[in-house]
Amino acid sequence: EISKGNIKVSLGNFKLLELAQKLKLIYKLNASANKVSFFYRDKKIKSYLCDFGIWLELFCYINLKRNRLFHDVRMSVKFEWNNTKRKLMEITNEIDLTFFYGIHPYFISCKLSEPSADALRELSMYPSYFGGGNSKSALVIVSKVNKERSYTYTRAKDMGITLIDGAMIKKG
């Protein structure tokens, strides 16, 4: 814990803010007697930093980048399914993370809780459309999944989707 005047800020939280400033995500970080203040670099950064779901995506992104076995790691990739026949109707999907392992594409969806059947179907579609048998998808869920009783686990396994739950994340 650090004190600046009468304010006490958890050292871990303040170090995160200092890191965010160093990374130019925020600026004018200031701790006074009554408050800690800063400015976000832009609206997009603010929305990312205030959205709990983005933290799981960032956690996965950072770990994929650190691993160095994977390349072309990307976050929030949008797919546009438009063709000349459907000019008036825009059809898009977004996948949380994509990367390559060698020449094989991988697709990851990050969820705070067990997803809907529609979300699983969407995730299962990417490998067959973009890489066939050489492509894989994974679902990362913050909560722990009971593998014996979970519809999500059973359905994901049947669809060829690797499931990584909170218990596996904690193990590393």
What are the residue ranges of the model-derived segments?
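Intrinsically disordered, low-complexity Ser/Thr/Pro/Gly-rich regulatory segments
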Residues: 1-172
